[in-house]
């Protein structure tokens, strides 16, 4: 299976469970999060996918998700490259705060703009556009060359960083991407044509 890219949002983290804005903070996976990653690895093994290289962010929730997947696939020794370019969107001053409490303080509409607007960033944080501006060049220079050499690549990262990447891959606009939701621990498999356009997209459901 050449020219293949598998994206997966990390398994549930401790801060997902506590309903906190996480961003660049580094909480561990919950027990459920570990189980989600293990289940994803088993599902991917069933598809016949075999990875040539893996990429992940600098944050442990994504790294441990990738490790679980590779272990389940019998590829625990595979090279795994870690880069902050793949980190979650930086939520700035909201990081570590409870989402419901932030809504009470700032109002539902303001928080919705911070979370779902393509261009508006929370205080001292990143917008989704900012996130894409660091992820897309990294993808083009470091990850896409593997795919163009007919290799299969795993990226274990985060909800917003992967949404920003998917936006560029699929040619979505700012309005279209804000409606895209990524569940934890669910693999998305892209295959590509020789000219790097998408040939197929498959979501591996539990």
From Swiss-Prot:
GO annotation terms (biological process): gluconeogenesis; glycolytic process
Assembly and interaction partners: Homodimer.
Main enzyme class: isomerase
Catalytic function, reaction form: (2R)-2-phosphoglycerate = (2R)-3-phosphoglycerate
SUPFAM superfamilies: Phosphoglycerate mutase-like
Pfam families: His_Phos_1
GO MF term set: phosphoglycerate mutase activity
InterPro entries tied to this protein: His_Pase_superF_clade-1, His_PPase_superfam, PG/BPGM_mutase_AS, Phosphogly_mut1
Protein name, UniProt field: 2,3-bisphosphoglycerate-dependent phosphoglycerate mutase
